[in-house]
A protein has these predicted regions:
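C-terminal motif of bacterial Sec signal peptides marking the signal peptidase cleavage site
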Residues: 16-19
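Structural motif
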Residues: 95-97, 142-151, 205-208
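Acidic, divalent-cation-chelating loop motifs in proteins
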Residues: 71-82, 120-128
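Positively charged n-region of N-terminal signal peptides that target proteins for export
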Residues: 1-4, 8
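Acidic, small-residue rich beta-repeat scaffolds with periodic aromatic anchors
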Residues: 21-71, 75, 156-237
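Short loop/turn segments immediately following the C-termini of beta-strands
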Residues: 91, 138, 200
Length: 237
């Protein structure tokens, strides 16, 4: 009986240790809860950004809209702001989304007819020492679709990794998050990072299309590097 009690006690201790070592919450590598997230949406550095691009009248299907300070917001995610000097700006009427990188302005995603920029995480996918951007966005008024892409900050080119228009659920909204398992006995810097893609419900706050909140509805896959190229890996692979 004493031996049985000892075995049971040992089992309980081992289970308790395992529970302490493994992080099972829905947090990204920065400790943010990925179940419910809100975009950063401020006026920080907007005047500086507008002094670079100037006020622009839009034409075509966007006639009547313009890139002006009134509709411009800084939507740089915290992880991007703390790890890089990149600033991301979005216009609340047209959803046009632009990045300020090393004093130059670049378009990082399509926007017409969708939310444009949704969110991004920094990721040196090609290991060249420069952090790139893994971006979630959407566009398309006739056929709403979400795009997962990588903006290479060295070549200033965008690589589409996943396009929902080719799937059986083209209108699903997406966001990205960098996640890593957490073990109390290890330095977090030594843990592998997983770049996950979540399906989401997106809400517009205060009729401002630059100010979004999104709630995760599930993990649909992850973005990994194969032969130097970022690729999307579905959950069922």
């Amino acid at each position: 009986m004493k031996r049985l009690f000892c075995l049971l006690l040992t089992g309980i201790v081992l289970i308790s240790l395992a529970a302490c070592q493994t992080n099972t919450d829905n947090s990204d590598k920065n400790g943010n809860n990925v179940d419910n997230m809100t975009t950063s949406c401020t006026k920080d550095s907007v005047d500086e950004f507008m002094s670079i691009i100037g006020e622009v009248e839009l034409g075509g299907l966007s006639t009547g809209m313009k890139l002006d300070e009134e509709h411009c917001y800084n939507v740089t995610p915290l992880s991007v702001a703390t790890q890089t000097d990149i600033k991301i700006f979005k216009f609340s009427d047209s959803c046009i989304s632009l990045a300020l990188i090393d004093g130059e302005v670049y378009s990082i995603c399509e926007s017409f007819g969708g939310y444009g920029f949704v969110n991004a995480v920094p990721w040196d996918y090609d290991e060249d020492g420069n952090l790139d951007l893994l971006v979630a966005s959407s566009w398309g008024s006739g056929l709403h679709r979400s795009i997962i892409s990588v903006f290479n900050t060295t070549t200033k080119e965008s690589i589409v990794v996943y396009d929902t228009s080719t799937t059986d659920n083209p209108s699903v909204d997406l966001f990205v998050a960098a996640a890593s398992p957490s073990f109390s006995s290890k330095d977090p810097q030594d843990l592998p990072v997983y770049y996950q893609v979540y399906s989401a419900n997106i809400e517009v706050n205060g009729n401002n299309l630059a100010d979004l909140s999104y709630t995760a509805t599930g993990v649909i896959g992850s973005v990994v590097v194969e032969n130097g190229t970022p690729v999307f890996k579905p959950m069922d692979d």
